[in-house]
Amino acid sequence: MYYSAGTYEAFAHPEKPKDVDKKSAYIIGTGLAGLTAAFYLVRDGQMKGEHIHLLEKLELAGGSCDGRKDITKGFYMRGGREMDNHFEVMWDTFRDVPSIETPGVSVLDEYYWLNKHDPNYSLCRATVNCGKDAHTDKKFELDKESAMALSKLFLTPEKDLEDKKISEVLPDSFWSTNFWLYWQTMFAFQRWSSALEMKRYLCRYVHHIDGLPDFSALRFTKYNQYESMILPLVKYLEAHGVRIEYGMDVKNVIIKDDGGRKIAKQIVYIKDGKQQTIDLIEDDLVFITNGCCTDTSCYGDQTHAPDLSGVKNGFGESWDMWKAIAAQAKNGEYGNPDKFCSDVDATNWMSATVATSDDEIIRYIMNICKRDPRMGKVTTGGIVTVKDSTENWYLSWTINRQPQFKSQDKNMVLVWLYSLNTNKEGNYVKKAMRDCTGEEICREWLYHIGVPTEKINALAKNSCNTTTCYMPYINAFFQPRKESDRPKVVPDGAVNFAFIGQFAETPRDTIFTTEYSMRTGMESVYTLLDIDRGVPEVWGSKYFVRELLRACYYAIDKKPITDIKLSFKEKMLLKVVMKKVKGTDVELLLKESGLIE
C-alpha cells in the first residue's frame, strides 16, 4: 500500500489482484469503516460479493452513523457529521455509489450540487443572555502568547506530544479566546484532551481557518447521516451480492503468531444466544472494528432520564472484544484499549433531539439564526454555542436542513443539541444534564433561545418532544495517547487481518471524522489485497506555504503583521526580513495573504 496525490492515480482503475477469487472476507462491524472496506473489496479488489460477509450485532447497519425514529418515543439523532472538501477517501468512494433519491447520479454528485446551491455558513455562532448574539464576529482574539503556543504546537513532532494534554502545551490565556470557543464546541475537545490529536487537527484543517468562525468551511448532507450516507452504501453492496449478517455478536478473533507471521485463525461470536465459531484459512481476510465511541449509549425520552446504572469504566462489548484480541499480542501490537475506555468522566457527553412544530418556538429560533427552518435550506449553518453556559452544561445546538428524515412531517423541525459538561447544573434547570428528562433538557434550551420563563414549562411539555442520549465513550479517542496505543491498520507481520475504524492508527489524519473511518477501510483492503493503486494521501495543506500564510492572516484577525504589537528587537528583525524579500515571489505571497499591504 502506498499513498498518492493528483488525478493520475485517482482516475485510474487498478488491475484485478492476484488470486482474489480464492479469497473471502469477514468484516466485523457495519459502521463507515466496515462498509467502506466492503466497498473497496468490491470495486477495486474485484472480490465476488458473495465472498464478503459483514458481521453486525445490531439489527441495523451504520454503527455510530445512525438516525432513527422510535414509534413510541420519537426521533433520535446521537450526533451529526461535518464534511470537508478534502475528505479524499470519502469522495473517492461516493463518486461511485449511486444516489437512492436522484436517478442516474452518484451520492457525491447529489451532495456537490446541494452544497453549491445551498452553501453552508452561520449568521450567529454564539449567544449570551437568553438568545442575544454574542458578537464573536468571526474573530479569534488570540493574544500573542496563545498565538505563539499554537504555532509551537503546530511544529512540534508527534512523538514529543505523546500522553500529553492540551492544557500542558497551551497557556491559561488561551481558554478565554474565541479560538478555543470555536474549536472546543465544533470538535468537542476538552482541556484534558490529547495534545497530539489537537496538533493533527491544526495541521489537517489549517486551510479552513477562515471558515472556522462561521462554518463556511463545512458541508452537510441533505438528510441524517444514515439516510444520506449509510443507506446508499448498503444498497450498493447488496446490489453486488454482499451479505450483511445481523445478530452476530463477535467476542474475539483468535490470532496465531507463527515466527512473526500473524494469522487470524478463528472468529468467536454469539448468535441467538449460542457461542459459535468461524474457522479461518490464510485466504480468509478479517477486518476488525476495534472499539466504538457510542458503546453503552444510554437513551432517555420526554419523561425519562437515561438509565446510567450500567455505565462503568472499561465496560462495553466493543472494548471487551478489543481487550480479548489485545491480550494475544506479544509486544502490544494490537493496541491498548484501556487507554481509551478507563475514564468515562473524561470521555462522556450527551446529546438530545427536540422535535417541535410550534410557531412561537420557531420564531425564537429565527430571531437567532435569521432563517426559517421550514424552507428546506441551511438554517443555523452549524452549532450555535451558548457562551454563558460555559461553567454550566456548556450547551450548543443546531438545526440542519429540514426535513432531517424522509418520514418527518413537513411542519416539524428537529433540533439537535449537545452538552460538554453533563455533570454540572444548568443555568435554568438546576440539575446535571445526565440526570434530566427530555422535557427538562428542552426547558434549558428554550431558556437559552429567549423564551420567557413563564412560558418555558408549558412549551417544553406540550409543544416539544425531546429524546436524549448519554454516551460514556463519545470522546474516548481524544484521550492522551501514544502512537502504539492504537494498532496499525495492518500490524507488522499480519497476513490476513486488519484493524479499522477510529481506534486504528493511520498517519496524519484526524479522528472523529467520517474520513478517518473510511480511510482505514480503504487502507486495510489495499494492503491485504496488495492493490496496485495509490491511496489518496491526507490533504497536505500544512506543507503549502500559501495556505500557511493565509492561516496566519486569519489567526491574527485579518491584520497586517505591521499592526501586531512587537518588541523593539522583533521590529528590527521584521525590517531586515522585509528588505530581504522585497521584489521576490515571497513578497507577492505575503501581499496575497494580507500579511503585508
Q: Predicted regions: what is each one?
A:
Residues 104-112, 246, 533-543:
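Short, glycine/acidic-rich hinge or "gate" loops at secondary-structure transitions
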Residues 203-285, 289-291, 303-304, 309-319:
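Helical element adjacent to the flavin cofactor pocket in flavoenzyme catalytic cores
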